[in-house]
């Protein structure tokens, strides 16, 4: 199995509800290691840049407004098949469709405020990690 890195965001709704520790526990219990983490409050420009691929979609303005509404946690996770493992832990984008025991089923209220984001591919993960972290900020875990 391949050791991969993926990118994760705990969104403003979950941060506001003090779910950071519970969500980190889910990552670690699933065998994913947190190799970089920080809290940030995105500016409008940062949010628009991160979600640029959605700029022509009708929900873009609401997405940017939500993602700038409060602090977020951004983290880089590492582990076997990390991209898929992380997405499995998150559950379906719509929490109403998410399997019981997944992050979105347990911590999200709606499809618009769905608690977390996860990279959808290794290529996306590389781009998203680089958007928030320099190479020096990544701390591969050797123990």
Swiss-Prot record:
Cofactor: Mg(2+)
Binding site for ATP: 11, 59, 87, 93, 104, 114
Active site: 117 (pros-phosphohistidine intermediate)
Keyword Transport listed: no
Gene Ontology terms, MF aspect: ATP binding; metal ion binding; nucleoside diphosphate kinase activity
Record-linked Pfam families: NDK (PF00334)
Top class in the EC scheme: transferase
General function of this protein: Major role in the synthesis of nucleoside triphosphates other than ATP. The ATP gamma phosphate is transferred to the NDP beta phosphate via a ping-pong mechanism, using a phosphorylated active-site intermediate.
Family in the record: Belongs to the NDK family.
Catalytic activity: a 2'-deoxyribonucleoside 5'-diphosphate + ATP = a 2'-deoxyribonucleoside 5'-triphosphate + ADP; a ribonucleoside 5'-diphosphate + ATP = a ribonucleoside 5'-triphosphate + ADP
Subunit structure: Homotetramer.
EC number: 2.7.4.6
Compartments in which it is found: Cytoplasm
Coiled coil regions in record: none
Protein's name in the database: Nucleoside diphosphate kinase
InterPro entries: NDK-like_dom, NDK-like_dom_sf, Nucleoside_diP_kinase, Nucleoside_diP_kinase_AS
GO biological process, one term: UTP biosynthetic process
Keyword check for ATP-binding: yes
Organism: Shewanella woodyi (strain ATCC 51908 / MS32)
GO terms under cellular component: cytoplasm
Keywords on record: ATP-binding, Cytoplasm, Kinase, Magnesium, Metal-binding, Nucleotide metabolism, Nucleotide-binding, Phosphoprotein, Transferase
């Amino acid at each position: 199995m391949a050791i991969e890195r993926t990118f994760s965001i705990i969104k403003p709704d979950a941060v506001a509800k003090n779910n950071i520790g519970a969500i980190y526990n889910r990552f670690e219990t699933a065998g994913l290691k947190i190799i970089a983490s920080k809290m940030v409050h995105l500016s409008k420009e940062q949010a628009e840049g991160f979600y640029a691929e959605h700029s022509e979609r009708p929900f873009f303005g609401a997405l940017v407004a939500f993602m700038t509404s409060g602090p977020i946690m951004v983290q880089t996770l590492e582990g076997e098949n990390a991209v898929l493992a992380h997405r499995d832990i998150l559950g379906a984008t719509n929490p109403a469709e998410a399997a019981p025991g997944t992050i979105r089923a347990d911590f999200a209220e709606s499809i618009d405020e769905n608690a977390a984001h996860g990279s959808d591919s290794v290529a996306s993960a590389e781009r998203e990690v680089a958007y928030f972290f320099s190479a020096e900020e990544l701390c591969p875990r050797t123990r």
